[in-house]
Amino acid sequence: MTIKDESESCGSRAVVASPSQENPRHYRMKLDVYSEVLQRLQESNYEEATLPDFEDQLWLHFNRLPARYALDVKVERAEDVLTHQRLLKLAADPATRPVFEVRSVQVSPRISADSDPAVEEDAQSSHQPSGPGVLAPPTFGSSPNFEAITQGSKIVEDVDSVVNATLSTRPMHEITFSTIDKPKLLSQLTSLLGELGLNIQEAHAFSTVDGFSLDVFVVDGWSQEETDGLRDALSKEILKLKDQPGSKQKSISFFEHDKSSNELIPACIEIPTDGTDEWEIDVTQLKIEKKVASGSYGDLHRGTYCSQEVAIKFLKPDRVNNEMLREFSQEVFIMRKVRHKNVVQFLGACTRSPTLCIVTEFMARGSIYDFLHKQKCAFKLQTLLKVALDVAKGMSYLHQNNIIHRDLKTANLLMDEHGLVKVADFGVARVQIESGVMTAETGTYRWMAPEVIEHKPYNHKADVFSYAIVLWELLTGDIPYAFLTPLQAAVGVVQKGLRPKIPKKTHPKVKGLLERCWHQDPEQRPLFEEIIEMLQQIMKEVNVVV
């Protein structure tokens, strides 16, 4: 059982550290940017800059947002900071949010990593506004890491020069949203843009310390350079979502205050049952010991139940809302019927408020994510193949029982004291419907299949894509797309065929397996039964005893 890392959810965005936690170097850089922006606005005689408390309000604005905001913003576009201030102020009014701003922009061609710095400077300066009618650049610069990572993708390499050559000639627009910050808000916004046929080329997402969002997208796909038509289309799309019942009504709720905190939480959570199972635990037999992990919505403790060592995931009473209860119910509903050596064993749950918890077997060696990224350990090929096989067997079992995990990643893979790896965390898993396809996004952008990112119908093959990213992690010990934000990674996966770069010394058949599993077309990805066979064949070739 794992506690999710909220900073890597599908609504992932930067979170502000407290002043005592802030990196001193970042603080100094933020102060420098603030000072330069202030000077430019005052020298340009902006009306806002003449107000008595403007300096304090501007500093407050920078402090509301993460250091990355100051590091990324172009000081030459100091007036854009005023726009962000205005949008955040308007977003405080429930009657007006979500608020947004649209403008046409000029995007410079990307320069390759090995370009001459003088050439790069000349190229960039030649695309800066130089006269009437010339468009300004976007507020934030393109990530220099994005181009470097895409060089590892064959899909991108073949078309990169074409893309770069045409970026500066197509109409581009910058759309900035501000509203209440909510889980999965980014998914809702990207879906909204997709409904209008807009392609996201750059994305920057920030959260304020007081619970608001500032999301900036550079898009193409709108045929006109003017902004009035696009602004009207966005307004109509938002109104359309507000007016529609059912699932889309739920989508637009992400723009509003969370009313669930004011709703009554039932005394007992109803879990569907066929009458043949009994999983409600006797809390008096539960002994709670050391806390081993903590998240925004729950804590994970080590403990014992009827003398058996267990892991106990508690929901935090002060954070419980109806969406959390739905996921809690779903996790219990799925786990109570799951029995496989490569799936974490569910032992029971307490569904009576205020003690809401799920009890599973305790996995002594923790998550694969911690093993790779916190303990800085690595797998040799033989062990890697065994781990990959364990995961494939667990996932094959789930798929045979029509369960799509939807959040497969190394943080949700746990290892016991014998080195056996098991699939865990079914909070967002779903039982596949009869049609074989599902919609609505969940999961984590860095591991998410392109069809899920695009809000297209998807099936169990989405898990196969995530499995490929997991396999790449096992090979490299790195975090996927580490130098991109989760949202930038998502844009790259969908629009540029971005994939992590496979190490040169990778076993050829492991490389082939990776490429099949993360194929853009879900139909071309293998089933887990096939993956098991391929892994077993590779293990024979390298003399691994299964």
UniProtKB/Swiss-Prot annotation:
Region (Disordered): 1-21, 111-141
Keywords, alphabetical: ATP-binding, Cytoplasm, Kinase, Nucleotide-binding, Phosphoprotein, Serine/threonine-protein kinase, Transferase
Phosphothreonine PTM positions: T439
PROSITE patterns listed in its UniProt record: ACT (PS51671), PROTEIN_KINASE_DOM (PS50011), PROTEIN_KINASE_ST (PS00108)
Modified positions (Phosphoserine) in chain numbering: S435
Protein's UniProt name: Serine/threonine-protein kinase STY8
Phenotype for K409R: Loss of activity
Domain Protein kinase: 286-539
Alphabetical GO biological process terms: chloroplast organization
EC number(s) recorded for this UniProt protein: 2.7.11.1
Lineage: Eukaryota, Viridiplantae, Streptophyta, Embryophyta, Tracheophyta
Species of origin: Arabidopsis thaliana
